Amino acid sequence: MRARNKRMEYMKELDFPFDAEYVLRKKKSLKRALLEREGVKYLNKKIAILGGSTTENIKLMLELFLLNNGIAPEFYESEYNRYWEDAVFGTPELDEFKPDLIYIHTTVRNLKIRPDVTMSSSQIDEILDAEYKRFEAMWEKIEERYGCIVIQNNFEQPYYRLLGNSDISDIHGLSNFLSRLNLKFAEYAQTHEKFHLNDIHYISAEYGIKNWSDPADWYRYKYNPCVAATPDLAYNLARIIKALYGKNKKAIACDLDNTLWGGVVGDDGPENIKIGREDAVSELYEEFQGYIRAHRDLGILLTVASKNDEENALAGLARPDGVLKKDDFLVIKANWENKNTNIANTAAEINIGADAFVFVDDNPMERNIVESTIDGIAVPDLGDPETYIRIMDGAGYFEVTGLSADDLKRNEMYKANISRATAAASFTDYTEYLKSLEMKAEILPFSPMYMARITELTNKSNQFNLTTRRCTQAETESFAADPNYITLYGKLIDKFGDNGVVSVVFGHVNDEDSTPDCKIFDIDLWLMSCRVLKRDMECAMMDELVRLAKEKGVDKIRGFYYPTAKNKMVKEFYADRGYTKVSEDEEGNTVWELETEGYENRNSVIAVN
């Protein structure tokens, strides 16, 4: 086993690009080492695998990659080829299991009907529709019965082409049939937020169709794909799952010299660095800059951490034939400080964890320093410039499972925060500064319009999150519909821009602990995006929560704080809001109470609704 940095959250053996043969061979010792890591608080999730082939190895590989991302899976595994029956008719075991997520592992081997050359065009359309509806019925039954996330494989290309090259264009070809069926699957995914595709059409092509589907493995053991390909499939699947549960990275810290351009700008001069279309090396760096720039449009925060004079760094970014410009970066740290220090300072400035970064640098020594000093940061071994994009893309640090309006304008939101910080520096009275922001909040019960964003926040927010409870969209929808619950989302707008939905609170009347003389309301979850810290948004949310609780006849509100490695900043949140601590256990979990009678509103700087 290769040496590991004991401080790191991630095990290098399971980072992309991994040695699949090694992972298969050492799966037991790798799992043991993952579970022995100190300080990792796992997110527990129940995952049902409904398979059209033997799935034992897929389950074992998926477990490793999920553990490496801080997710501890508990599995239900269907009997061989019982995926459809389990999904449509259910089983007592699956019902009792109550999955958070169902993964349906089907492949070309599981098609019930295939086209042949004797069929007419209309007959082929009919069997295509029948095959699609067979799957659609399964997805709808899962939604009806479990209301959970579904991940479904699309289809790989067949390992032979009966019609040769015409197999893809002729309606009788299986390749053509599968392409049309895959498109139907994709269209379903576009209109169902809890449904996601595991793109084995792409993964199998990347792996190599001839090697992906081994007839010997299929006929002897009913493996599809072959055993050797299961780590690749499981890694791709784990990318989706970790993204769904808030484990994506949020920012890129880029080196400059020999990373975003060829050469050293301080030595060669900005006019001589390699970028643009003049030669092959320049084109390589231009494409990589374009790849990094595209992440900005996805809401990924771009920053610079470079050992350089700032003047030289900015001159390099000013090259007219470069893709990335100064304004594409939220923060530029071009100086002679250590890069780990610069990344930590950048993280503090924009108010995210340093472990939310991917550090991109061509220099192995710089990578090692950053990796060994910042827990949880991702540091890919980029290789040569020709492989930069392949390594970054294959790792799936920023796997997209849905794009919200907030995602698309995230960079603008963080830039506005920097403008706010600049404005704050000109005030001596902080309350006057807050008033100058002209803040307006929309604080209302959960709305279908924002349900996806609310769910996303419950699975991503870690620092300002008092209980770190994670929720599926089905759960958030059920809370909104339950008259025993109070649910609130908060949007915040000020003169610098719209912050979007930034806070979520929900809880329920605790009938069990209530008495005829004292109705108790428990806050199940309270979270807020760190980009609106110290803006009194929490006060506005508290005021509205207490108002609604009083309408329900609540006499006492109870709040809970469960400490994690990341939420220490809110340890005294309830104390600062006038709550009284009533208990604390040996793990630091605390319970707080507030009498609603006599509560006075705390927000004085935000106009609400």
Task: Give the role of each language-model region.
Residues 502-585:
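Acyl-donor binding region in acyl/amide transferases
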Residues 442, 446-529:
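A conserved beta-strand-loop-helix scaffold within acyl/acetyltransferase catalytic domains
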Residues 260-287:
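Active-site neighborhood of HAD-like aspartate-dependent phosphohydrolases
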Residues 287-318, 332, 370, 466-471, ...:
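Substrate-recognition element of Asp-dependent hydrolases with the DxDx(T/V) motif
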Residues 371, 375-437, 547-609:
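Terminal substrate-recognition subdomain of acyl/acetyltransferases
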Residues 249-265:
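Asp-based phosphoryl-transfer active-site loop
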Residues 343-364, 370:
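Conserved Lys-Pro-Asp/Glu-containing loop-to-beta segment of HAD-superfamily phosphomonoesterases
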Residues 2-9, 35-44, 61, 69-70, ...:
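Alpha-helical cap/lid subdomain in secreted, periplasmic
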